[in-house]
Regions:
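Conserved ATP-binding subdomain of kinase catalytic cores across diverse folds
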Residues: 1-180, 185-191
Length: 191
């Protein structure tokens, strides 16, 4: 955070569904994030910058060896975040309806098709849920109550098995879209 810009760096981790372990992969995913998020925020996502080191000093798009990449975005005022507006009771009906209309149009024109359908397939969703439980299992009994973890896992598995036909119907009806994977009130700003 600089006041004018935000520089978002990806951690060198492997989340199985996203592998950021190499510099080239982090660059690729920075480029992907910029490309995908410009669909809704074209004036916010500026591009990808190289972070380099030269004589012990770090530079943005400067001289030296590239050691990292970052997504460069225009910094927005925190008081304009939807999550803050909601907490203060400042989200009015008109703003909510405008947001709903914008999102409906975005979802309506978002890409769909055979390659995208696989992401909404029951087996893919089930595998992703199981992967999440494997990755978070070590927190059960520590950060998250062990019993609650078991309840969440059982409820998720039960839902998936009860709704398998629904997942198949959604794929067959072309309802799976290339949209935003992390759209939530903390990521929506009204400026």
């Amino acid at each position: 955070l600089t006041g004018d810009y935000v520089y978002k760096i990806k951690k060198a981790v492997d989340l199985e569904f996203l592998d950021y372990t190499s510099l080239s992969k982090r660059k690729f995913y920075c480029q992907q994030e910029t490309l995908l998020n410009r669909r809704l925020s074209h004036d916010i996502y500026i591009g990808v910058v190289a972070i380099s080191i030269n004589d012990g000093c770090y530079f943005l798009d400067g001289p030296g060896e590239v050691v990292e990449y970052a997504v460069k975005m225009r910094q927005l005022p925190e008081q304009c975040a939807m999550v803050r507006l909601l907490r203060r009771g400042k989200m009015d009906r008109e703003t909510t309806e405008q947001l709903a209309q914008t999102l409906a149009e975005f979802y309506g024109r978002a890409a769909t098709g055979q390659g995208i359908n696989s992401y909404g397939a029951w087996e893919t969703i089930r595998a992703n849920c199981e992967e999440n439980f494997r990755q978070t299992d070590r927190f059960a009994g520590n950060i998250l109550d062990e019993r609650m973890f078991q309840v969440i896992r059982a409820a998720t598995r039960s839902f998936l098995h009860r709704r398998k036909v629904l997942f198949e119907q959604r794929v067959n009806a072309g309802k799976i879209r290339d949209c935003h994977g992390d759209l939530r009130s903390g990521h929506i700003y009204f400026t």
